[in-house]
From Swiss-Prot:
Coiled-coil boundaries: 43-74
GO molecular function, one term: DNA binding
Record gene name: greA1
Keywords for the protein's UniProt record, in alphabetical order: Coiled coil, DNA-binding, Transcription, Transcription regulation
Listed Pfam families: GreA_GreB, GreA_GreB_N
Keyword DNA-binding: yes
Protein name, UniProt field: Transcription elongation factor GreA 1
Amino acid sequence: MEPTFNKMTAAGYHAIEQEIEDLKQQRPERIRILAAAAALGDRSENAEYSSAKRDLGRLESRLRYLNKQLQYAQIVQPADNDQLDIGKFVTIEFLDDHDQITYQLVGKQEANLEQQKISFTSPIGQALANHTVDDVVTVNAPNGAYQVKVIAVKRA
């Protein structure tokens, strides 16, 4: 079976690398806390030991997950054209209320609505992919379809 690659921007890849480094720096302290809790004696009723073991397990699990993300990462460089793809910024106008908003189309690991980053696999991301300025696009969202107009497309 072919592995599925995770498309992402270079910035998203570097953010994962940074999180891995941060977690690796936290690991020795978590191990020290676990060892200190284990030294307190009976582990069957040692809440500090159980908590420290759980914390270290979460850290190790997150590291494995992030390393897999990098292992199967495919960094996408935005094409030098007017079509919307990963890494580019798009300004859209919602045709029902004429509100405008600018998003960056990113890989699914990078999506963050608070930062106006939408995944290329989201309903709106899929609908906008490969469209250009002045295109009217129908977005098939879980709560119903709506239309948006592409106002601008810019490279990052």
